[in-house]
Every structure is written in structure tokens, then in C-alpha cells.
């Protein structure tokens, strides 16, 4: 009888011991290597922590609500993005946090607002200001550091930025751009967190420039077909696929030709709008805008019919 009573007690003791060993191994703090007896336990990547041990490894600030874990190390938001952000500031070379206010240039460079300064004189560069961008060194500088002659009011534009818009190449780049001076004139295209107007010389170039796109088969549209397309564009600048199919049946043109025609027409409208903003930008400051040359055709500011008859097919889809 006594033997029978001792066996269940022995089994229960073994179970309790086993549970105790497992409990100790799971509730051991990974940071301080001490046993956790707190009511609440923090767990990350199958590792347990005291609440007080969850702090940034750099600034040691306590992280009660949110933390970042990388290679076994805990970081706060500021230091995590500073070291491991996918986007780096071209000025200070530090990471960019999602809450940081930054400038994004057309060359793909990103700057903190406080880091957007001239690399030569240290002057802070304002949004919309013409600047010199060195894609190789990832730096920006003022226009005053560009070697311009005194009798030329219009700064030359690098050939890699703006395609030749005139039959005379010297009208666009009258001064050679050799490898010893790799700067290129660019405009700020976007400013995160701000709503600035932007202007780009490349927006005013003609579609016929070979540097903008490859040459494709040309299609000539008859006047009656053009009238139908213009009427549709005045009502719906971006028709649906079903509407383009109806136009194809009505005009006899292929859907691809109709699609490209609407793409080019919308592009002309946008270019004209940018041109008006570009001229207004100078007029508001009492300045005379530099001349803009277009190759093979003179652009009419109010009538598009003169250059909508012939166009090149593009590869872009709606």
C-alpha cells in the first residue's frame, strides 16, 4: 500500500522539476542574463527581456511602446534609421527617417533640409533655386561658382541634362563641358513636406529630339480623323480603353495609334503649361527669360492643331 502511494508522488515531483527547468530557460533575460520574475515579459525574436532592459543600445533611452531590432541589438527609431535606413542623405551621409523633412533632386539625390547647402561656400540653397549638381561626387553648389562670361545672361545647360532643342548646338551649350568640370545644371523637382512649384529646362524641349526617345514608325492622320480625335480630347483628355475602341471603329485607326496620339497630346498640354509657369516665374521678378529654341517647328501657345497631325509612336502604356 505504501509503495503504491509513493509512485504517484514521485511522478508529480518529476513533472514539477521539469516544468521548473523549462520555466527558468524561457524566462531568462537575454540582455542582463538574469531570471525574469516580473508580471510582464517582453519577447523579441523568441528572446525574453525585462521591461527595463528594453532600451536603445546607443542612447540607452527606454523603449516602452516601439523599438527596432537588428542583429541582436535594440535601437530607438532615430538611431536605427541613422545607421540602417535604405535612403542616405547626400550631405551628411546619414540615414533618412520617414519623419525627416528632405529635398529630393532630379538626379535622385536626397538631402535633409538643413544639409541642402552649397558644398563650396556653405550657403543654404532655397527651393526652386537654380543649382549645380555633381552626380559623381553627389554634391550641390551655387550657380555663382559656374564659370560664366559676363556678356551671357543665360547660363548654359549641360548636354546630358537637356537634349538639343535647336538645329545649332551652340545655342544650347555654347561652352564645352569637358570631364574636368562635371557639373550639370538641374532644378529641384520635389521637396518632401513642402508644396513648391518647380521648373525644368527639359520640360520645354521638343518631342522630335532624338535624345529624348528612340525613333519609331510615323503615322499621318487625315483631317477628318484629326477632327474626331480633337473633339474627343476636348471632352475626355484620357479616354478609357472602351472609348478608344469606339474611336478606332469610327476613324479606321488602330487602337495603338489612337493611344499614342492621346499620350502625345497630353504631353503637349503639360509642356505648354510648364512653359507658361516658366515665363511667369521670370515676369513676377521683373526679369527677362532666356530664349528657348525649338527644333523643326515653332510652338504656338494656343493652337495644337499645327503639330498634332504627325507624331511618333511611343512604348508607354496608359
Swiss-Prot record:
Pfam family, one: LIM
DNA bind region: 214-273
Keywords: Developmental protein, DNA-binding, Homeobox, LIM domain, Metal-binding, Nucleus, Repeat, Zinc
Keyword match rRNA-binding: no
Any one cellular-component term (Gene Ontology): nucleus
One Gene Ontology term of the molecular function aspect: RNA polymerase II transcription regulatory region sequence-specific DNA binding
Protein's name according to its UniProt entry: Mechanosensory protein 3
Amino acid at each position: 500500500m505504501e509503495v503504491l502511494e509513493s509512485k504517484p508522488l514521485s511522478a508529480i515531483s518529476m513533472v514539477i522539476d521539469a516544468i521548473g527547468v523549462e520555466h527558468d530557460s524561457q524566462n531568462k533575460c537575454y540582455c542582463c542574463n538574469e531570471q525574469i520574475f516580473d508580471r510582464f515579459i517582453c519577447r523579441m525574436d523568441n528572446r525574453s527581456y525585462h521591461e527595463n532592459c528594453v532600451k536603445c543600445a546607443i542612447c540607452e533611452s527606454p523603449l516602452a511602446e516601439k523599438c527596432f531590432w537588428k542583429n541582436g541589438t535594440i535601437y530607438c527609431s532615430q538611431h536605427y534609421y541613422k545607421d540602417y535606413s535604405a535612403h542616405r542623405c547626400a550631405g551628411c551621409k546619414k540615414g533618412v527617417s520617414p519623419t525627416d523633412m528632405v529635398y529630393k533632386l532630379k538626379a535622385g539625390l536626397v538631402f535633409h533640409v538643413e544639409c541642402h547647402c552649397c558644398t563650396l561656400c556653405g550657403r543654404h540653397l532655397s527651393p526652386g533655386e537654380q543649382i549645380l549638381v555633381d552626380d559623381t561626387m553627389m554634391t550641390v553648389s551655387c550657380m555663382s561658382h559656374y564659370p560664366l562670361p559676363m556678356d551671357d545672361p543665360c547660363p548654359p545647360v549641360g548636354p546630358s541634362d537637356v537634349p538639343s532643342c535647336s538645329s545649332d548646338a551652340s545655342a544650347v551649350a555654347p561652352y564645352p563641358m569637358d570631364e574636368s568640370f562635371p557639373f550639370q545644371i538641374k532644378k529641384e523637382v520635389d521637396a518632401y513636406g513642402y508644396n513648391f512649384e518647380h521648373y525644368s529646362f527639359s520640360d520645354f524641349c521638343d518631342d522630335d529630339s532624338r535624345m529624348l526617345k528612340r525613333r519609331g514608325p510615323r503615322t499621318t492622320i487625315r483631317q477628318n480623323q484629326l477632327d474626331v480625335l480633337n473633339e474627343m480630347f476636348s471632352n475626355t483628355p484620357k479616354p478609357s480603353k472602351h472609348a478608344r475602341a469606339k474611336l478606332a471603329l469610327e476613324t479606321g485607326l488602330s487602337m495603338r495609334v489612337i493611344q499614342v496620339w492621346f499620350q502625345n497630346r497630353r504631353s503637349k498640354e503639360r509642356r505648354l503649361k510648364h512653359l507658361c509657369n516658366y515665363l511667369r516665374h521670370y515676369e513676377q521678378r521683373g526679369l527677362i527669360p532666356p530664349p528657348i529654341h525649338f527644333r523643326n517647328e515653332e510652338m504656338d501657345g494656343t493652337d495644337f492643331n499645327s503639330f498634332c497631325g504627325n507624331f511618333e509612336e511611343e512604348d508607354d502604356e496608359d
